[in-house]
Amino acid sequence: MAQNSVSLSAGDQANRMAHRSSQGDLNPSAMAWAMVSGDSFLVTRLDPNQPGPRPPARPSVRADRRRVPVGGRSRSRSRQGRFSPYPIPGVKLDLLRSVLQQRLVALGTALATRISA
């Protein structure tokens, strides 16, 4: 029985080789490894009637937009305009400061009125 060696993965051609018979049969563990590693040509038999490998899918438009800033703006600037249901910390501190200032003025006015009376 003649045996030929077939690479299990494109990255590890030097060390990992799977031996298969000329009939194209693999033992169950080799077939499982080929399926897990993504080498489908080891699992499927080559048939001249089947079409060749499909070209890679076109990358999505969304992925392209991430690489190229739209209108020359950076990503951080584009995030500033997004709506957030949560209050911005700076606005919350300003509100707290104004409320405390109003109460302090009211308390001072009440004390001044009481002292003068």
Curated annotation (Swiss-Prot):
Signal sequence range: none
Cited InterPro entries: DUF4687
Biased composition (Polar residues): 1-12
Top-level taxon in the UniProt lineage: Eukaryota
Region Disordered, residue ranges: 1-30, 43-87
Membrane-crossing segments per the record: none
Name of protein: Uncharacterized protein C11orf71 homolog
Native organism: Mus musculus
